[in-house]
């Protein structure tokens, strides 16, 4: 089920809001595909989804660097795999593939995102919480960088 739940929280309000937005965009895409919406509508959703994905991954990776997350390289690799599948979906939609194939790939991306948030992203939650605690301890504890909430 493609729904946000509190157990998906990663300890950063900003990242949680990004995740909610990504889930909403994937739901919109799935709905458009199932409803047989015009190709232009689906293309617009895909462009927005790809752009927001890039924005979110960059923000998340920046926060993980600030948090000194040890699993950052693996996390970036997971993000890159998502980007590949998203690109594959865009190619499928631009080609002559039927909507059933596109919907199948869209469903895969939806499932992947939920598993990623509940699995990979939960692994960095302690690092985010430690970063927040360092910030609360005062200046000089975080290298002077912005908070994960900004």
Regions found by a protein language model. Name each.
Residues 1-150:
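Small-residue-biased structural context
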């Amino acid at each position: 089920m493609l729904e946000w739940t509190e157990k998906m929280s990663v300890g950063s309000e900003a990242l949680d809001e990004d995740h909610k937005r990504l889930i909403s965009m994937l739901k919109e895409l799935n709905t458009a595909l199932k409803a047989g919406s015009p190709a232009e509508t689906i293309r617009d959703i895909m462009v927005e989804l790809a752009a927001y994905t890039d924005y979110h991954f960059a923000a998340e990776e920046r926060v993980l660097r600030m948090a000194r997350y040890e699993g950052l390289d693996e996390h970036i690799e997971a993000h890159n795999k998502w980007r590949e599948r998203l690109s594959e979906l865009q190619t499928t939609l631009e080609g002559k593939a039927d909507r059933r194939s596109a919907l199948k790939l869209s469903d895969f991306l939806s499932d992947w995102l939920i598993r990623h948030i509940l699995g990979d992203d939960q692994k960095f939650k302690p690092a985010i919480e430690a970063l927040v605690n360092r910030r609360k301890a005062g200046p000089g504890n975080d290298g002077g960088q912005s908070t994960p909430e900004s």
